[in-house]
């Protein structure tokens, strides 16, 4: 059995078309959804991510402002810019690209963003809302993963979901989202004693560690759904995920590829969050 692919590019195109339609409806009312992207320093990967986010906004009817500052920018100066964006009525979402230079406290900066403009879903108010099941902005990557499961009509009720990774950006919010859909959730991490024993019980596996081949074919039960959040490079320098794709695709029922899986969905859900922020006006 070869797994069916969950195509993140195709699903993104569908969702972005809907974003563009809703953005046009807002513009007809005199509201252009606006995203401010703040980049500090010259991290090459961050520059690529930021360009992709800005382009996605422009391609789908959203207004995007890129503020690029030198790495020497002080924490106080960055906080002042965030406060100014909080008070800008043309901006509905604020994204501060991580990582930040070492002299800037990323937590302090994220907490300075107004919760109503926290379209990355990283603010403690967003995390708390997710925890207790209240409306709020969901972090874009796990939100995209949930949309992928939804796209295949997968009913999570009563299913065992294993999340590999416990980051605040993916692992923890992913577990909460799965729990909201009535899955039984296990979170695995670097101190988990027998990862294979856990994953072999799983109906759904989300790999979000940032380490190649953390999930191999012998760790997956036949027919399981495998979501690969990882972004790594193999020995040839090619993009790969956390999952041994070639092996696991022969066992799993569904699998997401890297590239072309979760990656495009992350940016798409950023657009959705920004749009929904503007629609609340």
Swiss-Prot record:
GO CC field: cytosol
Molecular function via GO: methenyltetrahydrofolate cyclohydrolase activity; methylenetetrahydrofolate dehydrogenase (NADP+) activity
HAMAP family assigned to the protein according to its UniProt record, in alphabetical order: THF_DHG_CYH
Keywords: Amino-acid biosynthesis, Histidine biosynthesis, Hydrolase, Methionine biosynthesis, Multifunctional enzyme, NADP, One-carbon metabolism, Oxidoreductase, Purine biosynthesis
Any single Pfam family the record assigns to this protein: THF_DHG_CYH
Subunit and interaction comment: Homodimer.
Protein name, UniProt field: Bifunctional protein FolD
Organism: Polaromonas sp. (strain JS666 / ATCC BAA-500)
Entry EC no(s): 1.5.1.5, 3.5.4.9
UniProt xrefs under SUPFAM superfamilies: Aminoacid dehydrogenase-like, N-terminal domain (SSF53223), NAD(P)-binding Rossmann-fold domains (SSF51735)
Pathway where it operates: One-carbon metabolism; tetrahydrofolate interconversion
Catalytic activity: (6R)-5,10-methylene-5,6,7,8-tetrahydrofolate + NADP(+) = (6R)-5,10-methenyltetrahydrofolate + NADPH; (6R)-5,10-methenyltetrahydrofolate + H2O = (6R)-10-formyltetrahydrofolate + H(+)
PROSITE patterns recorded: THF_DHG_CYH_1, THF_DHG_CYH_2
Sites where the protein binds NADP(+): 165-167, 190
